[in-house]
Every structure is written in C-alpha cells, then in structure tokens.
UniProtKB/Swiss-Prot annotation:
It comes from the Bacteria. Gene3D superfamilies: Ribosomal protein L9, C-terminal domain, Ribosomal protein L9, N-terminal domain. Keywords: Ribonucleoprotein, Ribosomal protein, RNA-binding, rRNA-binding. GO terms for biological process: translation. The lineage of its organism: Bacteria, Bacillati, Actinomycetota, Actinomycetes, Mycobacteriales. NCBIfam families: L9. This is Large ribosomal subunit protein bL9. GO terms for molecular function: rRNA binding; structural constituent of ribosome. PROSITE patterns: RIBOSOMAL_L9. Belongs to the bacterial ribosomal protein bL9 family.
C-alpha cells in the first residue's frame, strides 16, 4: 500500500514522505490515527501544502524557543521549598519535572512542558543546587540552576 505521511512516524519517515507499507499496517494503524493519507494525485498537492505550513511553523517555533530560552535564563533565583527528612538534606519523596515546571512559572518565567525538562537523574532527592536542562527546540536548549530548599 502506497501512503503519504502527514506526521513524523518513527522508523518510517517524515511528513510528506511517500512510503510503501503493508496493507494491514496502513489500514489499521497509520490511516485511522491520521498519520498518513492514501497516495493519489490530489493528495500530492495536499502534501505540498502541509510541507509549506510545517516550514513556516518551524521558523516561528525556533523564534519562540529563543524567546523562551532568554526568559528562562534571565530568571535570577529559581527555588523550590520541600519537606526534608532531618538535617541530612534528604527529601521526603522527590522533586519531579512537574514540580520544576511549577517552580519556573512561580518565579515569573514562562509555562514549560514537563516533558521538555531534563533532571540530573529521574528525580531530585536532596537539597541544594541542581542543574536543569530545558529542551525547547531541537536547536535551542536552556540551562539553569534550581535551588532546592528544605522547609
């Protein structure tokens, strides 16, 4: 079955690519989820429109990502107050990506998706300064330090 991809599909291709897949994969997975359309003459024109729109969106996305990076890195003091287990500095529970996203917003920064945050490990489990990376765009990465303080 010959299809034209409308979205990025792992191990298959990028939007606008014409691919040959097995009938079942196309009919049962790609087409119902809107990841592809059947390759016809009219569909090729539609794909060209999709490509132009994605290129324009990519340019706007890059500019927006750079603005977010400046806003995040411009924040002076991003800190988070959490319950600690005594004087050792260990935390009750842990600090997750969602907590970090909330701390950025509380410090006056932009709203950041928790899936774009890279914590030093899966979770932060101790007080102190921790380096956080925010993947805003494939070409734009913001870095800042989060100060975890015991309450």
């Amino acid at each position: 079955m010959k299809l034209i991809l409308t979205a990025d599909v792992d191990n298959l291709g990028a939007p606008g690519d014409t691919v040959e897949v097995k009938d079942g994969y196309g009919r049962n997975y790609l087409l119902p989820r809107g990841l592809a359309i059947v390759a016809t003459r009219g569909a090729e024109k539609q794909v060209e429109g999709i490509r132009r729109a994605q290129e324009a969106r990519a340019v706007r996305g890059l500019d927006h990502a750079k603005e977010l990076k400046d806003a995040i890195e411009g924040l002076e003091n991003i800190s988070l107050s959490v319950k600690t287990a005594g004087d050792s500095g260990k935390l009750f529970g842990s600090v997750t990506a969602a907590d970090v996203a909330g701390a950025i917003k509380a410090a006056g920064g932009p709203v950041v998706d928790k899936r774009n945050l890279e914590l030093p490990k899966a979770h932060i489990k101790a007080t102190g300064k921790h380096a956080i990376v925010v993947n805003l765009h494939p070409d734009v990465v913001a870095k800042f330090h989060l100060n975890v303080v015991g309450a």
